[in-house]
Amino acid sequence: MRKSLIFIGLLFFGLFAKAQEMPLMRPIPDHSFAHFERNHLVFPGDNTAMERFFAKMDSVIFLGQGNVSIMHIGGSHVQAGSFTQQFRDNLFSISDELMGGSYFVFPFTAGKTNNPSHFMVSYTGEWEYCRNAVSRPTDKRMGLAGAAVTTTDPEASISIVTRERYPSDLQPEYTFNKVTVLGFSETENVVPVVHCDSVTIPGLYDEWLSTYTFQLPDFTDSVCIGFDSVAGEFTLTGVLLDNGMTGVSVHGVGVNGASVPSYLRCDDFERDLDLIRPDLIIFGIGINDAAEKNFEKETFKQNYGELISIMQRVNPDCALLFMTNNDSFKRIKKKKYEVNPNGKIVQQAFMEMAEDYGAAVWDQFDVMGGLRSMQNWEKAGLAQKDKIHFTRDGYKLIGDLLYNALIESYMQHVRQNAKQ
């Protein structure tokens, strides 16, 4: 692996030193209503944190050493999976040997809601689901995933397969030999186990982290999680897969309807975040905040400040990348919509926060065409009729755009360092 990555590093160096056309960029279709020529990362303030992240990327690409962890966090745009999947697949299309060891997932299918497209889940038994976007007295404690599934069914199980629902030529193969189940039993008599072929594997319990870790006998792309008790209750709040490889890991964390306060309500968020310890956090939260009738920019920034404080306690050196909201509309009556003007306010808020926190901004709002542009995306088959969400093709396109903006900035970093 190391030799292959060093070869990729030399390829990077040669291309950048000669300032040739950048072949690692994804092709972007021409749409006159969009501003794709402005698809760049913007740094309203200091870029030291991003340079630090790029230096870690250098270590992986040029030396074949170390690990880089990227987390993309948001709402339904992230839970759908296609956006993060496209960004992730683009990154690993440079070389599948860039793929790092860890992979955080949540089995949404067991909660009878849509599962991200970049892995598949099946289940047996009865499960109860709760999510951070809806507050109920019966909700269980939640962590990084922003969701939880609970069962009292002794026959319950969850199976996870790391294959994409919509395979593409870019899709890398991911296998693992270590599984960490995040969760707890309030009745204290239910313990998860892993079924691998005909063997039942017990886990190593960490009381502080509330995790059960299972070492598998071989590398695999699938796992079945069951339980060793005939009675009681267990709540699962996430699953971390790992294979011990060096490289880049990309984690998608998204819950339908989630706003910034949604994640602040998750009691175990900070504790769980330390399991993946991101070096780059891509913030895609904001579309649901901006949909509120009494949306206020300063409250939005204050909430984000609390969330960023959590992130920085886990990793003070992590780089932050804010995504401005996509343009969106509100339904005021059946088949009648009006544009949500808060998109411009959120755009300004992110620019201000980026200056305050030394973060980057990917100005999705501007790149897609600005206010009312979602109508054009819908006409082009890239956005859904609700004028909030994208179609699968639309999510793939914004995944390409985000990837291009980040890799362009990284290429500039490499080129500048090549001159030194």
Protein language model annotation of sequence segments:
Residues 56, 60, 76, 80, ...:
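Structured segments of extracytoplasmic/periplasmic soluble domains
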Residues 79-195, 204-302, 389:
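Conserved SGNH/GDSL esterase-like catalytic core that processes O-acyl groups on lipids
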Residues 1-28, 415-420:
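Bacterial Sec-dependent N-terminal signal peptides
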Residues 66-72, 79, 83, 245-337, ...:
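Conserved, compact domain cores that house catalytic/ligand-binding motifs in diverse enzymes
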Residues 327-420:
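Catalytic His-Asp segment of secreted/periplasmic serine-dependent ester chemistry enzymes
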Residues 74, 183-185, 324:
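Short beta-strand/turn micro-motifs composed of small residues
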Residues 27-72, 143-147:
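Membrane/wall-proximal cationic-aromatic binding patches
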